[in-house]
Amino acid sequence: MAVAAWLQVSPVIFLLLGAQPFPLSFLGAGPAPVFAADRSKWHIPMPSGKGYFNFGKILFRNTTILLKFDGEPCDQSLNITWFLKSADCYNEIYNFKADEIESYLENLKGKKGLSGRYQTSSRLFQNCSELYKAQSFSGDFTHRLPLLGEKQEAKENATNVTFTGDKIAMHEPLQTWQDAPYIFIVHVGISSSKESPKENALSNLFTMTVEVKGPYEYLTLEDYPLMIFFMVMCIVYVLFGVLWLAWSACYWRDLLRIQFWIGAVIFLGMFEKAVFYAEFQNIRYKGESVQNALVLAELLSAVKRSLARTLVIIVSLGYGIVKPRLGVTLHKVVVAGALYLLFSGMEGVLRVTGAQTDLASLAFIPLAFLDTALCWWIFISLTQTMKLLKLRRNIVKLSLYRHFTNTLILAVAASIVFIIWTTMKFRIVTCQSDWRELWVDDAIWRLLFSMILFVIMILWRPSANNQRFAFSPLSEEDEEDEQKEPMLKESFEGMKMRSTKQEPNGTSKVNKAQEDDLKWVEENVPSSVTDVALPALLDSDEERMITHFERSKME
């Protein structure tokens, strides 16, 4: 739980930190991973012997569950039993495991430790042909019965419960009675006939098809809000792209490399959201997911987050702002980005494919440690870069860093509040009754990231003054002054300098005293909230040398 919470807050810290000079970095750090819509249509081959099928979903009221059977004729007798149960707590279906079906059914019959209501019915078929003819259940239909001490209330209200009839046809749909989490279980008991050979005992006798359809076709109540959210996010990213293209077209001659990367991150985010929305639409109308589309979406998300973190590190190091090149540090940046791409891609693919669940959970651990190390690296680099900008007294670049750092502080505070809220509401409660709001746990982080991306776009928007953010080393100015000095001497050679009388008015002393006062204020008084928020870090020998070099040039 702690690892998952850190994975949610660390991307916010990470993106916000580095995205200051480089807006597109923000989008790359994705929040909590997306869990794509679950399928609502299954084709299950049923072998000889006893078999179970189950699913747990949050369903709309009047959602229909349709059972279909198809296969070759057989002489085996079949006993088909189904259970449909609603739950008051989402934990009951979330923690339900397939290998616990038999014990769960025993508790259901004994009404032990369960909540909600349930329906059940059973029918014996003499052979497969009888099953394929859509025979009906009769006599074994059980009314919905409340659990957990609500027997008396159920008896009083039993006469008010209405059904479509005394018999339910096997191929007729079952129907839910309220918006709630549901568990559906089908038990197929198959007895081999005496005439059938033993070697065919394990062969697939028939195929059972289960379909779940509600007001929005195959889309369930837990997936419908996320589909709407991804549709809105697609529109938002399209607007971001149009706005960025318009700015870039107006000032295309003065575009910086950073602004090209911002456009690339916007495009990746738009593409990622479109793939997820298309997957939800496919589930809605076909009931089955396209696994390749899910894998593509997860890989796009991993590339986007890795690119964002790499760019944030580069910008926090001052590349293009106070340094013309990174030198040997560039290799460290590339390795960090490659490692994050590897771990995030592995975790996403394992999660959406449903294979190796334990490995997918373990993939969170290296991601958490890597995010921690990268955040610490960004904090140190960002502090050093802001110190150099203060020494150079570059007000424009320093203001850019401060504005985004203030945004960072607010976003980190908001992320902490959201983590506390989601933990208290969804994770540590014994009965998760607010299942209607589960989609917010994923959507809130993506919404927060989009807001930060918009702030980055505003700070780094293309304009006529783009070059004010470009790297301008002080050494070039010194070289120009040195080249101008001998030319001035030759121009005025042979001319006499008139002596000027020094006026002892004390002006020089006053100016020197003012400079000393300003220097003391600059060194001892923090100039903004960012100086207080970012802790003072010990200067290394290399930092002292750089600081001394910058001061000597200014003097």
UniProtKB/Swiss-Prot annotation:
<keyword id="KW-1133">Transmembrane helix</keyword>
<feature type="disulfide bond">
    <location>
        <begin position="89"/>
        <end position="431"/>
    </location>
</feature>
<keyword id="KW-0732">Signal</keyword>
<feature type="glycosylation site" description="N-linked (GlcNAc...) asparagine">
    <location>
        <position position="160"/>
    </location>
</feature>
<keyword id="KW-0472">Membrane</keyword>
<feature type="transmembrane region" description="Helical; Name=7">
    <location>
        <begin position="438"/>
        <end position="458"/>
    </location>
</feature>
<protein>
    <recommendedName>
        <fullName>Transmembrane protein 87A</fullName>
    </recommendedName>
</protein>
<dbReference type="InterPro" id="IPR009637">
    <property type="entry name" value="GPR107/GPR108-like"/>
</dbReference>
<feature type="topological domain" description="Lumenal">
    <location>
        <begin position="425"/>
        <end position="437"/>
    </location>
</feature>
<feature type="signal peptide">
    <location>
        <begin position="1"/>
        <end position="21"/>
    </location>
</feature>
<dbReference type="GO" id="GO:0005794">
    <property type="term" value="C:Golgi apparatus"/>
</dbReference>
<feature type="transmembrane region" description="Helical; Name=1">
    <location>
        <begin position="226"/>
        <end position="246"/>
    </location>
</feature>
<keyword id="KW-0812">Transmembrane</keyword>
<keyword id="KW-1003">Cell membrane</keyword>
<dbReference type="GO" id="GO:0071260">
    <property type="term" value="P:cellular response to mechanical stimulus"/>
</dbReference>
<keyword id="KW-0966">Cell projection</keyword>
<feature type="transmembrane region" description="Helical; Name=4">
    <location>
        <begin position="326"/>
        <end position="346"/>
    </location>
</feature>
<feature type="transmembrane region" description="Helical; Name=2">
    <location>
        <begin position="258"/>
        <end position="278"/>
    </location>
</feature>
<feature type="topological domain" description="Lumenal">
    <location>
        <begin position="279"/>
        <end position="305"/>
    </location>
</feature>
<feature type="transmembrane region" description="Helical; Name=6">
    <location>
        <begin position="404"/>
        <end position="424"/>
    </location>
</feature>
<dbReference type="GO" id="GO:0001726">
    <property type="term" value="C:ruffle"/>
</dbReference>
<feature type="topological domain" description="Cytoplasmic">
    <location>
        <begin position="247"/>
        <end position="257"/>
    </location>
</feature>
<feature type="topological domain" description="Cytoplasmic">
    <location>
        <begin position="383"/>
        <end position="403"/>
    </location>
</feature>
<dbReference type="GO" id="GO:0005886">
    <property type="term" value="C:plasma membrane"/>
</dbReference>
<feature type="topological domain" description="Cytoplasmic">
    <location>
        <begin position="459"/>
        <end position="555"/>
    </location>
</feature>
<feature type="disulfide bond">
    <location>
        <begin position="74"/>
        <end position="128"/>
    </location>
</feature>
<feature type="topological domain" description="Lumenal">
    <location>
        <begin position="347"/>
        <end position="361"/>
    </location>
</feature>
<keyword id="KW-0325">Glycoprotein</keyword>
<feature type="region of interest" description="Disordered">
    <location>
        <begin position="491"/>
        <end position="515"/>
    </location>
</feature>
<feature type="compositionally biased region" description="Polar residues">
    <location>
        <begin position="502"/>
        <end position="511"/>
    </location>
</feature>
<keyword id="KW-1015">Disulfide bond</keyword>
<dbReference type="GO" id="GO:0032580">
    <property type="term" value="C:Golgi cisterna membrane"/>
</dbReference>
<feature type="glycosylation site" description="N-linked (GlcNAc...) asparagine">
    <location>
        <position position="79"/>
    </location>
</feature>
<feature type="glycosylation site" description="N-linked (GlcNAc...) asparagine">
    <location>
        <position position="157"/>
    </location>
</feature>
<keyword id="KW-0333">Golgi apparatus</keyword>
<keyword id="KW-0597">Phosphoprotein</keyword>
<feature type="topological domain" description="Cytoplasmic">
    <location>
        <begin position="323"/>
        <end position="325"/>
    </location>
</feature>
<feature type="transmembrane region" description="Helical; Name=5">
    <location>
        <begin position="362"/>
        <end position="382"/>
    </location>
</feature>
<feature type="modified residue" description="Phosphoserine">
    <location>
        <position position="540"/>
    </location>
</feature>
<feature type="topological domain" description="Lumenal">
    <location>
        <begin position="22"/>
        <end position="225"/>
    </location>
</feature>
<dbReference type="InterPro" id="IPR054101">
    <property type="entry name" value="TMEM87A/B_GOLD"/>
</dbReference>
<feature type="transmembrane region" description="Helical; Name=3">
    <location>
        <begin position="306"/>
        <end position="322"/>
    </location>
</feature>
